[in-house]
Amino acid sequence: PMIIEASINESVSKDVNPHIPYGPEEGAEVGIACAQAGAAIVHYHARDPITGENEWERGLETYLECYRLIRRECPDVLVYPTQRGYTLDKAPHLFALAASEEGLELATVDVFPQGGFSSNDSSVMITLMEELQRHRVPYSIGVREIGHMRHVARYRELGLVGDTLVLKIFWNETSVGPTPGMRGLQMYLDEVPPGVTCQW
């Protein structure tokens, strides 16, 4: 089956697209419309309602209000926030959302390797996944290069990737990763660890 995820604003400004939602009410309006059109997942960046500035980890109340409004109309849709990775001080909103009455149904972990892997790896991505597991929050893993799949294999060895992997493959117009297309996609899928079912 196809699962549709709607990323409704990211960091795009209204100057580029006047329909881009900023604050929680606008985010909810667009999120509800996407859910009613068939999206199963809504990804929303908390943004200042006037300036559109990303609130990132400071946007807990914005996230909560947007998600309450979406779930009131579309209780079956999954909604989840952004997180910048790099350091855990950029992810406190994830754990606050997980502990809130609204809860956190999904998170995303992008591969931003720091210093490679060793037997005692303490990279922030591993710590983040361990914390998400402790809070019982499922997560997808985002990759931008074929080499990132080697990290996914290591996460599997460490028990951070289960038998089912939700993989986000980022394509863009820059010269990062393989050329977008079926051949490039297959290059990623060929590197999925043995015994793992991959949803992408």
Protein language model features and the residues they cover:
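Catalytic cores of alpha/beta
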Residues: 22-25, 87-99, 146-155
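Glycine-rich, proline-tolerant flexible connector loops at the mouths of alpha/beta enzymes
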Residues: 40-66, 170-171
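Active-site-proximal loop/turn and secondary-structure-junction residues that shape catalytic pockets
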Residues: 8-12, 46-50, 83-87, 111-115, ...
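Catalytic alpha/beta core domains of metabolic enzymes, predominantly
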Residues: 106-200
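A structural motif
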Residues: 36-39, 76, 104
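Conserved, mostly hydrophobic/aromatic
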Residues: 27, 34, 45, 107, ...
